[in-house]
A protein has these predicted regions:
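Bacterial N-terminal signal peptides
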Residues: 10-18
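Sec-dependent signal peptide cleavage junction
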Residues: 17-29
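Catalytic centers of hydrolytic enzymes
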Residues: 28-287
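Bacterial Sec-dependent N-terminal signal peptides
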Residues: 1-10
Length: 287
C-alpha cells in the first residue's frame, strides 16, 4: 500500500530552505540509560509516513527498513566508512571495505526499529525514537552460504503471529539484495539459541534472488553492514560472530548508526525523503 503523499518535493525544498537554525537544547535518554545531546538545528522532511515500528518491521519489508539499510550500505559503498575504522584496524591495514561495491549489502533487525516517522518535518529526536540504542556500524564479511543461513535463521518466526512476535524481532530488513522466504516450508530447528530462537539445522526456506542486480554466489564473499549488536550475535544472529572470526577484516567501527542515517538523509537525499521511499521497494517476498 502506498502511503499518502503530503507535500511535493519542490514545496518541501522551499520549506527546508526557509528553516531557521536554533541552538541545541534537547537531550534523549536511550534504552541503555545514556543521555544523548540532540542537535535541534538538524531538520529534514518526509513526504510519506515511514513505517517501521516493531510489529510492521517484524512482519515484512517496510519503507523505513529500506531507508535505514540503504543508509548503511551507502555509508560503506561511498567510502564514508573509511574514516571510522578503529586505530588498531588502521594499523593493521584495514582502512576500507575489502570487496567491490556490488558485494556490499546491509541487514537490520525489524525488531530494532522502534517507532514510525510520520510524514512532515522531523529531526534527531525522531531518529532517536526509531533506534533508542547506542548501536555502532559493524562490517561482517560472510560467504554467500553464510549470508543465506543468516537470513534463514532471522526469518524463522515467519509467518508473523502473536505467538511468534518475539522470534520475528530478528527478521531482516535489507539493502543491496532481494530474497524470498517460503513459509510453506517449516523452519528446521537445530540447537536452541537465546530465549526465542534456534540455529538452522538445514536450509531451504530462504532464497537470495539477487545481490545488487547480480546473480547470487554462495561461494563469494560479501561485506554485510549491520549493527555491533548483530556482529556480537544478538537475536538469531549466531552466524555473524562465527563469520567475523573467520575473516579478520570484520570489525566494529566508531560510527554511530543514527548519525549515519542522518548523514545519508542530509548528504544523499538533500534532507527530503521523497518518492523512492513512498512504499516498500519489493526487496523481500514472503510466500
Amino acid at each position: 500500500m502506498k502511503f499518502k503523499k503530503v507535500i511535493s518535493m519542490a514545496l518541501a525544498l522551499c520549506l527546508l530552505g526557509g528553516m531557521t537554525a536554533t541552538a541545541s537544547a534537547s537531550t534523549f535518554t536511550d534504552a541503555h540509560g545514556n543521555v544523548i545531546e540532540l542537535d535541534d538545528t538538524l531538520e529534514a522532511y518526509a513526504n510519506y509516513d515511514l513505517v517501521g515500528a516493531d510489529d510492521a518491521a517484524r512482519m515484512g519489508e517496510t519503507n523505513l527498513g529500506d531507508l535505514w539499510t540503504d543508509a548503511l550500505r551507502w555509508f560503506a559503498a561511498s567510502g564514508k566508512i573509511n574514516e571510522y575504522f578503529e586505530e588498531d584496524d588502521v594499523t593493521a591495514g584495514n582502512t576500507e571495505i575489502a570487496v567491490d561495491a556490488d558485494h556490499i549489502v546491509a541487514l537490520w533487525n525489524g525488531g530494532n526499529l522502534r517507532a514510525d516517522v510520520p510524514a512532515g518535518k522531523f529531526g534527531e529526536q525522531q531518529l532517536a525514537e526509531v533506534l533508542p540504542y547506542p548501536n555502532a556500524v559493524a562490517v561482517a564479511y560472510m560467504t554467500g552460504a553464510q549470508l543465506v543461513e543468516a537470513l534463514e535463521a532471522a526469518s524463522q518466526g515467519l509467518p508473523y503471529t502473536e505467538d511468534t512476535a518475539a522470534a520475528c524481532a530478528s527478521f531482516m530488513q535489507v539493502s543491496g539484495l532481494k530474497y524470498t522466504v517460503d513459509t510453506a516450508k517449516e523452519y528446521d530447528k537445530g540447537e536452541a539459541y537465546g530465549d526465542n530462537w534456534f540455529k538452522a539445522a538445514s536450509l531451504g526456506r530462504v532464497t537470495i534472488d539477487e545481490v545488487n542486480g547480480q546473480p547470487f554466489d554462495a561461494e563469494a564473499t560479501y561485506a554485510v553492514i549491520t549493527s555491533n549488536a548483530n556482529f556480537k550475535g544478538m537475536d538469531s544472529s549466531y552466524t555473524f560472530p562465527a563469520a567475523a572470526e573467520e575473516n579478520e577484516k570484520s570489525t566494529i567501527t566508531t560510527a554511530v548508526v543514527r548519525d549515519v542515517v542522518w548523514m545519508y538523509i542530509s548528504e544523499e537525499l538533500g534532507n527530503v525523503i521523497g518518492d523512492d521511499y513512498a512504499e516498500a521497494q519489493g526487496r523481500i517476498a514472503i510466500k
